[in-house]
Curated annotation (Swiss-Prot):
Chain spans, region Disordered: 209-244
Domain annotation UBC core: ranges: 20-176
CDD domains in alphabetical order: UEV_AKTIP
SUPFAM superfamilies (UniProt xref): UBC-like
Source organism of this protein record: Drosophila erecta
GO biological process: defense response to bacterium; sperm individualization
Regions that span the bilayer: none
Pfam families: UQ_con
The protein's name in its UniProt record: Protein crossbronx
Family: Belongs to the ubiquitin-conjugating enzyme family. FTS subfamily.
Length: 244
């Protein structure tokens, strides 16, 4: 009987810890939404809140017009663990901070360790944006042997034309696979579809109309609320992420 009680207490404690972690991760997602980062989109996996799907759209610099998919893997005890989240690109990406073999992004130069309550995922994504906007500036003051791809760094400093050509090759290859069948059945995986006039045309027209004319406020907005886009957390529910 005592053993059963102890086991139940352990199960309850584990459940409570899991729920607390889920809400902390939900808070991180809400912060990302509020920051409105341009050209970068992420969403937690439906099946596992420690795995996030993301897409980066280059808007300036050498990586303009790039569309790079990536995955974020959070440590098991995130955000209380000092271990850093892992960002892995799903294709070849030449960059001094990206390992050419694992496609992993080194964020340790900006985040030596994860500080719970001080470091947040939106800052991590902002760092990703910054180093792709200006890769040369991102390696200033860092020794070549401390970079994940020292050859890329050297090429960037000595032969920018060749570096840009390599970047363009990456961009071309990534776009060739943008409409590929998703590698997972997870419903939160970010999927792109080719434009279909009958499906997407009406939506495009509504977007254009919205730019030229202010739409009438919804009932929710009229009552002091605000409209939101599609979310993986259903409106009116408090169940976040993968809690069943």
């Amino acid at each position: 009987m005592t053993l059963d009680l102890d086991a139940n207490k352990k199960d309850d404690k584990l459940l409570l810890t899991t729920i607390q972690q889920e809400y902390k991760i939900l808070a991180e997602y809400k912060m990302i939404e509020s920051e409105k980062l341009s050209g970068i989109y992420v969403i937690p996996s439906y099946a596992n809140s420690l795995q996030w799907f993301g897409v980066f759209f280059g808007r300036q610099g050498f990586y303009t017009e790039s569309v790079f998919r990536f995955t974020i893997l959070l440590p098991d005890r995130f955000p209380d663990d000092k271990s850093l989240p892992t960002i892995i690109f799903q294709q070849d990406v030449i960059h001094p901070h990206v390992c050419p073999y694992t496609h992993g992004l080194d964020v340790s130069h900006a985040f030596p360790e994860w500080r719970c309550g001080e470091d947040h995922l939106w800052q991590l994504l902002k760092y990703l944006q910054t180093i792709f906007s200006d890769p040369l500036d991102s390696i200033r003051g860092i020794e070549l042997d401390k970079l994940k791809d020292s050859e890329a760094a050297e090429l960037l400093m000595t032969n920018k034309e060749e570096y840009v050509a390599r970047v363009q090759k990456n961009i071309k290859e990534s776009k060739e696979h943008i409409f590929d069948t998703p590698p997972t059945e997870d419903p939160h995986y970010i999927v792109f579809e080719k434009f279909q006039q009958d499906v997407h045309g009406p939506v495009l027209e509504r977007i254009k109309a919205g730019r030229s004319k202010q739409t009438e406020p919804s009932a929710q907005q009229a009552n002091g609320g605000h409209a939101t886009g599609l979310s993986w957390v259903k409106e009116g529910e408090f169940k976040p992420l993968s809690i069943e």
